[in-house]
Structures are given as C-alpha cells and as structure tokens.
Amino acid sequence: MLPIDVTDLWPLSRDLLIQILEDRCSDRFVCERIWERLGYREVAAGAWGAGPETPAEWSEAFPEAPQLIAERPASVRLTRSIAKPHKQLLKQQLAFPGYRIGELYPRRTRRATAVNWLLAWLAERSEPLMEQGPLAPELPAPSNPVFGHPGDLPVT
C-alpha cells in the first residue's frame, strides 16, 4: 500500500469512471488520476515526475509520468500491475460489457484498463466506489476515436 495522503487525490466515483469509459474527457485527465495514485507529482506546469511514494518499478522505468493511454509500454505495465483477483472489476462493479468489434481502438481499450486499475486501487484499500462525485471537464466523444480529443497524444 502506498503511503499517499488520499485527501489530496481526485475522488473516484461510478459516474467519473463511466465518463472515462465513454471517452468524454481527455486522456491527460485519465493519466493524472493514475499518476497521483502512483505517487507522481506535478513538478512544473504540466510536467509530472516520480515522487518518493512512487513504487520503484514505476519510477525506474518511468522517472517522468508515463503517457498511459498514448504509449504501449506504459499501458502494458499498467495492465500487468493489476492483481489477478482484480482483473474483472470492470465487469463486476460497472457491469461493463466491453467494446464491440467496431469500437475496438487502442485508446478505448487502454481507457478500460485505466478504469480497471483505478477500481483495483480502491479494492486494494478496501475503499468503496462512490456513486457520484466530481467529474472531469466534459468533452463530447471524439468524432474519430483513433485520434481522440484535441490535445490527446497520438497512440503508439
């Protein structure tokens, strides 16, 4: 368990996680919710770096906060960091059926991984998922999910 002061973290809620799954917020917002829970801290305007609470396996591989949606190595590490008992939380807690064949894009599947990781983070701390809470700045779903929202980095 990371010694992170949870009062400094953006609150997680069912509504927020659905907003992420429905691609109605920026990739950057999604990354920031995970970075703060991994102990990364904003070190300059828009730049995040590993902090003293960042697990060594993350800070050594990614001294600067990784682009979890845009970059495959970071997404793979995030997937592998979810403990086996928590791999199905997306389906169990949010009744998420997955994406249909025509909806399968790396950005979307990586967002689903991010949501599952956030659910696992709560589960590891025995914290409940709130029904409602603050949402991300609302964006319309992108017209082309491959490219995402204006400002989202290209997926590699």
What are these regions (language model features)?
Residues 1-7:
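N-terminal organelle transit peptides
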Residues 6, 15, 19-23, 115-120, ...:
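Low-complexity, disordered linker/stalk regions enriched in Pro/Thr/Ser/Gly
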Residues 59-156:
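Low-complexity intrinsically disordered segments
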Residues 10-100:
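Conserved, aromatic- and glycine-enriched, well-ordered alpha/beta core segments
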